[in-house]
A protein has these predicted regions:
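A short core secondary-structure module
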Residues: 1-34
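Short, structured patches in soluble enzyme cores that scaffold and shape functional sites
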Residues: 4-7, 24-27, 41, 54, ...
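Short, solvent-exposed loop/turn segments at the edges of secondary structure
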Residues: 17-18, 45-47, 192
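Alpha-helical interface subdomain recognition
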Residues: 49-51, 55, 68, 72-222
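Cytochrome P450 core scaffold surrounding the K-helix E-X-X-R motif
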Residues: 61-66
């Protein structure tokens, strides 16, 4: 596990982001010796609440230079946002494919429901939104791979992809009607899972605040 810890008191730091250091901690050694992990039951992945008390970490476990941890972390966060965007795009495409296939197969009043524009248009719109988000994701990845600043692109890609995936999930469930709530179809499960990405690892509101301040030059809101 990687911990971001303050190694210089805030009052002595030139900026709030200074004086933070990354430490590599082996949980196999630390559990019960300074770290207590309490599981939090949820539907997506394994999550724990950590309590850290008098944990000792050897200096050789420091990642990078002391006091420069936040700078190292921020670079990885941009990659994480692009990664989450890619995951949301994959989810969105899954919802679109499932909805389109069902709309072709489901016959009501002797015609497939996909012949109706009221069914077609939401599927087409979800497809457009997902593919548009993918273009922004590629823009973020291209800049990251080139070593160029990509904070704006990575954040916007994550925001667009999370919204597109959620809208595609809602559309897919609506297309399936009552069957969308049947566990065998996996739609209701994936709908609940994809909603996570408007909350974590960074919320949509924080992304909007970042774009407003750092891209558009608006006053800092918090």
């Amino acid at each position: 596990m990687i911990l971001l810890v303050r190694t210089t008191p805030l009052a002595q730091a030139a900026r709030r982001g200074d004086g933070l250091t990354l430490l590599l901690v082996d949980l196999r050694d630390a559990l019960g010796r300074g770290i207590e992990a309490r599981p939090i039951a949820n539907m997506v992945n394994e999550t724990h609440e950590l309590f850290i008390t008098d944990l000792e970490v050897p200096v050789e476990n420091r990642v990078g230079d002391e006091g420069q941890g936040l700078r190292l972390l921020l670079d990885g966060l941009n990659a994480e946002r692009a990664l989450i965007a890619a995951e949301c795009i994959g989810d969105g495409r899954w919802f679109v494919r499932r909805a389109a296939a069902y709309a072709k197969e489901r016959v009501v009043f002797e015609r497939p429901i996909g012949r109706n524009q009221g069914v077609q248009f939401p599927i087409a719109e979800a497809h457009i939104e997902v593919e548009a988000a993918d273009l922004m994701r590629w823009a973020a990845c291209t800049r990251f791979d080139a070593g160029e600043p990509c904070g704006a692109e990575a954040n916007m890609a994550k925001c667009l992809a999370a919204k597109a995936s959620w809208q595609a999930a809602d559309m897919c469930l609506q297309t399936h009607g009552g069957y969308g709530f049947a566990a065998d179809y996996d739609i209701e499960r994936k709908l609940r899972e994809t909603r996570l990405y408007q909350v974590a690892p960074v919320s949509t509101n924080l992304i909007l605040a970042h774009v407003a301040e750092h891209v558009l030059g608006l006053p800092k809101s918090f």
